[in-house]
Every structure is written in structure tokens, then in C-alpha cells.
């Protein structure tokens, strides 16, 4: 790496109101490597005063940023893409060390964050107004598409870089300012690293702030604050509901986009290519230890191929290497922290007590939990009802195609889904019957492309990300009329 591209420094500082500084809460956050438990950083936490300064600075800076021409805003996005390329190894290293990502997953995440930033470079020139017909003589009726103003982004720890960039890059490109509250487990990859990248890319001071603070101190205040007109949240359904209540019922009403929990069904119909289905089910479940909102949560297999699928799948899973996420061959690395591990161990015990048949298991080594596969799972078991954010999966038997669809739709969630079949017509018909935001035929449910709508139904959230849908989310219509001739009023 050249001298010009020396690694970013001072990651314990926060970008607040255009300045890198320590938080004022008087308490520190220890950022740990999930695999080694090494302390990576100690960050002085921000308080409500820091948050207020960040939001007010964003409101002030946004006006000039929105007034920049579309080419100027697009160029900042393109500069950021170049920096993603130049700092690829540095970024991937942070993803591995801070979030426990395997090298495979870290490379995927780097590519996804880069892709949405590149897509965002096209957004400023894709914003269009409209001229509407009017029955009022002499009236010209216009609709302008304008930035919302200031966007608050609350990002998760599982895909922190990408799931922050997915809101950040489009929102900035469309003329908004942003304040990020990253997850406490991943403050660098969920915010601070992106702040460095966009600062280097030429984003004006104050347009972006990153506030690292405890949820108990600044969580509700982040949503309640008068400045942001939009809150983008990715995380659990429980927290998302609370954010929705505050945004809709608080003193300052605001728009929300909520990308929440998932319970993705992976359906294998009797005519499926089992080789492909088994391989896909392995990747779709165990990428990033299953800590993905779209990850396979339930495998539903039609009766006539159930036993063969279960046996082949279990044998394939047994061969997966697990352990050190920095090694290129590792497939299953650590879960994010000890609390997450304990919750997964409770779910394993519950699955066994409820009668699920153990096909694959293993003892935890630190925060590394080996893959667990359960067969003969029924819809009333916890492992089928609840989102399992880890390397556990249950397999359900479906009597026929209709029963498979019934099982697929039996969850309160509706984010992503998948179905395997040799008949594309059958697959499309089945997919149209699934109540979810996304369904993939003969592929894994873990898919996200920068020009395609990403979002869920039911308790999986509200709103859509990416492409034209991002324009809809991060801008608003402003109806303006011009009365060219005096209008006759009734009195």
C-alpha cells in the first residue's frame, strides 16, 4: 500500500458535525474480535449532546449539498467506489476482525457495498419531476422530486458495511444528509469506516456524522429528534416495532424504512435437481454462520425426496470446515458474541426436547458453534417458528406441493424465500403463492442486487431498498402550481 493510502487511523474517534472527536458520554465501548476476543478498539461513547450536534450540523450542511448538481454528487459516489477498490484489503480485514466474518463472506460484503455505491452514482440523474394536466384555466401543475432532508440510519452487526451503505450511498446521492448509529458490536464497519471513505471521496463536512452511543442513552433520542425526516433501520422485528411507534406516534412524525427479521423457507419440490438443491441449501444456510436476515431458516422438502435429501444434506454439512474466519478455507466462523452463542445453545436444547432428530451437531469452541442440522421438524417447534440467527437449521416434511406452500407461508415473517424445481412454470406459480418480498427459483434466498427491490412483507418490515425504489424512499413529491392568468374565485 502506498504512503498516500496508509491505513485509516484514529478509529476510536467519531465524525460528529464535521470533526473527528471523542464522544462526551464519559464511558467507553470495548470493540472485540468475536473469534480471538482481542480488544480491537476502545471508543469513548457519544451522548445526546453529541447526537444533537450531529443532527443540527447535518440539517445545515444538507441545503448546500442538495444544491450541488447531479454530476457533482455522482462524482463523490464514483470517488468512493475508487476508494473501495484501493482499500479493498483494509476493508475486508476490518470486516473479518470486527464482525467475525469468514474471508468468503467479507469479500462478498465488500463487493455488495461497492456495488450499491456504484449504483448510487446513477441516481442523481434518474430523479424526474412531472407536469400534470389541470382543469383550472391558466394553471401549470408541476411535481418536483426533492430530498427528504436528513436521514437517520441505524445499522446492524451482521452485514454492517453493506447494510449501512445500502441506505447511506443512495440517500447521499439524492441530496440528503445522514447521521449513522452503528451497532455496538461493529462501530467501525457499520459507520466509522464509511465515514472515512466518504470524507476521502470529497463529501462536504457536516453532511455525514457517525454517532457511536449506547441504545439506552441515545437510542430513542436518535428516532425522536426533530431533525431527521426519515429513519432507516435494519435489525430485529421487536426493535423495529418500537422505532415505528416512535416515528408514527411521537411529537415529530417521520418516514421509516424497516428491514426486520426473517424466517426464510427453502422449498425442495419432488422434481428438483437434488445435487443443486443440496449445494444451495448448504450455502444459503451457513454463509456467515447463518447470521443473515435472508438466510435459510426452514428447509421444506416434498415427501418423495425427503429422506434422500436429508441424508445427502447432512453428509455435506458434516464436511464444512469451521473455526478461524481469517483462513480462506473456513466456511463457519464465530457468532458475534457470547450472548448470541448462549441463545443458540438454548435453541438447540429446545429443538432436542421438542423431538427434532439430530443429524449434525458439535460442541462450541469459544464463539464458534459448529453446524447443527435437525430433521423431522414440525411447524409448531421453536426452530421452525422463530428466526434462527446462527448455524442451526431444521428440515420439515411436506406431503405434497400444496402442503409445502402452506408450510412456507406459516410464518409471521415474509422477507426472502426460495423454491427448487425442474419446471420453471411450476416454480413461478409456487413463487407467486409465497407471501414474501422476495422469492428465488433454483437459487438461495440470500440475494441482494443494487438495482432490484429489497424488502419484506408481514413482520419482516416496511419499504424497499435499491435502484428506483431507493429514489422513492429517500425523496418526496412536492406539488407546485403556477397560475399564469388571474383565476376567477367563487367569492
UniProtKB/Swiss-Prot annotation:
GO terms for biological process: p-cresol catabolic process. It holds the Pfam family Aldedh. Disruption phenotype: Cells lacking this gene are still able to produce 4-hydroxy-3-methylbenzoic acid and 4-hydroxybenzoic acid. InterPro entries: Ald_DH/histidinol_DH, Ald_DH_C, Ald_DH_CS_CYS, Ald_DH_CS_GLU, Ald_DH_N, Aldehyde_DH_dom. The active site is at residues 259, 293. One of its GO terms (molecular function) is oxidoreductase activity, acting on the aldehyde or oxo group of donors, NAD or NADP as acceptor. SUPFAM superfamilies: ALDH-like. Belongs to the aldehyde dehydrogenase family. This is 4-hydroxybenzaldehyde dehydrogenase (NADP(+)). It comes from Pseudomonas putida.
Amino acid at each position: 500500500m502506498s504512503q498516500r493510502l496508509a491505513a485509516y487511523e484514529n478509529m476510536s474517534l467519531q465524525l460528529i458535525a464535521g470533526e473527528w472527536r471523542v464522544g462526551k458520554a464519559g464511558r467507553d465501548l470495548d470493540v472485540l474480535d468475536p473469534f480471538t476476543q482481542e480488544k480491537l478498539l476502545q471508543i469513548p461513547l457519544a451522548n445526546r449532546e453529541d447526537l444533537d450536534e450531529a443532527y443540527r450540523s447535518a440539517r445545515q450542511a444538507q441545503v448546500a449539498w442538495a444544491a450541488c448538481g447531479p454530476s457533482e454528487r455522482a462524482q463523490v459516489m464514483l470517488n468512493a467506489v475508487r476508494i473501495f477498490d484501493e482499500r479493498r484489503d483494509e476493508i475486508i480485514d476490518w470486516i473479518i476482525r470486527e464482525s467475525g466474518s469468514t474471508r468468503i463472506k467479507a469479500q462478498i460484503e465488500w463487493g455488495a457495498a461497492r456495488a450499491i455505491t456504484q449504483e448510487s452514482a446513477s441516481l442523481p440523474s434518474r430523479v424526474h419531476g412531472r407536469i400534470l394536466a389541470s382543469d383550472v384555466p391558466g394553471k401549470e401543475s408541476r411535481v418536483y422530486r426533492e430530498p427528504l432532508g436528513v436521514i437517520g440510519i441505524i445499522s446492524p452487526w451482521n452485514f454492517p458495511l453493506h447494510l449501512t451503505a445500502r441506505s447511506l450511498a443512495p440517500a447521499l446521492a439524492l441530496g440528503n444528509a445522514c447521521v449513522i448509529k452503528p451497532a455496538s458490536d461493529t462501530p467501525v464497519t457499520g459507520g466509522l469506516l464509511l465515514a472515512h471513505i466518504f470524507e476521502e471521496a470529497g463529501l462536504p463536512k457536516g453532511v455525514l456524522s457517525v454517532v457511536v452511543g449506547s441504545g439506552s442513552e441515545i437510542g430513542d433520542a436518535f428516532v425522536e429528534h426533530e431533525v431527521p425526516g426519515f429513519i432507516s433501520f435494519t435489525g430485529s422485528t421487536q426493535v423495529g416495532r418500537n422505532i415505528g411507534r416512535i416515528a408514527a406516534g411521537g411529537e415529530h412524525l417521520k418516514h421509516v424504512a424497516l428491514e426486520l427479521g426473517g424466517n426464510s423457507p427453502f422449498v425442495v419440490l419432488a422434481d428438483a435437481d437434488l445435487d443443486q438443491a443440496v449445494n444451495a441449501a448448504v450455502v444459503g444456510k451457513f454463509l456467515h454462520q447463518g447470521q443473515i436476515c435472508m438466510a435459510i431458516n426452514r428447509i421444506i422438502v416434498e415427501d418423495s425426496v425427503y429422506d434422500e435429501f436429508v441424508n445427502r444434506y447432512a453428509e455435506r454439512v458434516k464436511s464444512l470446515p469451521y473455526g478461524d474466519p481469517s483462513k480462506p478455507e473456513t466456511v463457519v466462523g464465530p457468532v458475534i458474541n457470547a450472548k448470541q452463542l448462549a441463545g443458540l445453545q438454548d435453541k438447540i436444547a429446545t429443538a432436542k426436547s421438542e423431538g427434532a432428530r439430530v443429524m449434525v451437531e458439535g460442541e462450541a469452541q469459544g464463539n464458534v458453534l459448529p453446524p447443527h442440522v435437525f430433521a423431522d421438524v414440525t411447524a409448531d417447534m421453536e426452530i421452525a417458528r422463530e428466526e434462527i440467527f446462527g448455524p442451526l437449521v431444521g428440515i420439515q416434511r411436506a406431503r405434497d406441493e400444496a402442503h409445502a406452500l402452506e408450510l412456507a407461508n406459516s410464518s409471521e415473517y415474509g422477507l426472502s424465500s426460495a423454491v427448487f424445481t425442474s419446471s420453471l412454470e411450476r416454480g413461478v406459480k409456487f413463487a407467486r403463492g409465497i407471501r414474501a418480498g422476495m422469492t428465488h427459483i433454483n437459487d438461495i434466498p440470500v440475494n441482494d442486487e443494487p438495482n432490484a427491490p429489497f424488502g419484506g412483507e408481514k413482520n419482516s418490515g416496511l419499504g424497499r431498498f435499491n435502484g428506483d425504489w431507493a429514489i422513492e424512499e429517500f425523496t418526496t413529491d412536492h406539488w407546485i402550481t403556477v397560475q399564469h392568468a388571474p383565476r376567477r374565485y367563487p367569492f
